[in-house]
Amino acid sequence: MGRVIRAQRKGRANGVYKSHKSGRIAPAQYRVYDFAERQGYIRGCIRDIVHEPGRGAPLAEVAFRDPYRYKTNKEHFIAAEGQYSGQYVYCGLKAQIAVGNVLPINRIPEGTVVCNVEEKVGDRGTFSRASGCYATIIGHSEDGDKTRIRLPSGARKTIPGSCRATVGIVAGGGRTDKPILKAGNQFHKYARKRKSWPRVRGVAMNPVDHPHGGGNHQHIGHPATVSKWASAGQKVGLRAARRTGLVRGGQKEKMAMKAAAAGV
């Protein structure tokens, strides 16, 4: 009888694969979308730029004066490139277009780069949040009700024009350019995110541990495709694949053709 495989243990969200909450500062999100932002603007001051373990982008600790009560509210925004401690941040419909300010996306001109874009009005930030990422505004509808943006992946998406966005690029760009160098650095990187590392291949395991394990040499021994209706312990490999192989005209096929030509 086989064991419970790695994919099944991950899905249970137990302590082994659950990311640690200790050391985390706060959720990186906008203010609650209130009357002050919908009709005018509100000013905040960046108290500090902080690092949160497990997050690549730095966070800006912004203090806002509550427009309805005599107190100060503290929010944590994803910092834009060029922001600094003591800088004023303006959020709202009538805010100026400057790096770090938060505006409805239909108020920002075409061609502007933005980050931390909302997908739905008031969801407090969804797209382009990783360090060095940005989205580009392609165009607006005539009534300003819809806006089309290009995401960091190159995909284009249409979102409501009232969704908020930060002008500029997310700070911390070039983070992935620095080499890891040591396995210890890689270990601590994945330990913070609670991802299994190093990742053992299924064909290198015993048959009791994985459907691809076992044999006198490392091979799967049967088609890698598996039905979407298969049991949880069988769902490894190419799950519910519509097709297999290289995509004709794709980047991987072109690289394979170049390698074959160079070998000739």
Swiss-Prot record:
Span-the-membrane segments of this chain are none
| Keywords on record | Cytoplasm, Ribonucleoprotein, Ribosomal protein, RNA-binding, rRNA-binding
Q: Name one GO cellular component term.
A: cytosolic large ribosomal subunit
* UniProt-annotated location(s): Cytoplasm
One of its GO biological process terms is: cytoplasmic translation
The reply to whether Transcription figures as a keyword in the UniProt entry is no
A single GO molecular-function term is:
rRNA binding
Q: Which InterPro entries match?
A: NA-bd_OB-fold, Rib_uL2_dom2, Ribosomal_uL2, Ribosomal_uL2_arc_euk, Ribosomal_uL2_C, Ribosomal_uL2_CS, Ribosomal_uL2_dom3, Ribosomal_uL2_RNA-bd_dom
Q: Has UniProt tagged this entry with the keyword NADP? A: no
Q: Which domain of life is it from?
A: Eukaryota
Family membership, please give it. Belongs to the universal ribosomal protein uL2 family.
> What PANTHER family does the record point to?
LARGE RIBOSOMAL SUBUNIT PROTEIN UL2 (PTHR13691:SF16), RIBOSOMAL PROTEIN L2 (PTHR13691)
Under the heading NCBIfam families, the entry gives: PRK09612.1
Name of the protein in its database record: Large ribosomal subunit protein uL2
Chain's gene name: RPL8
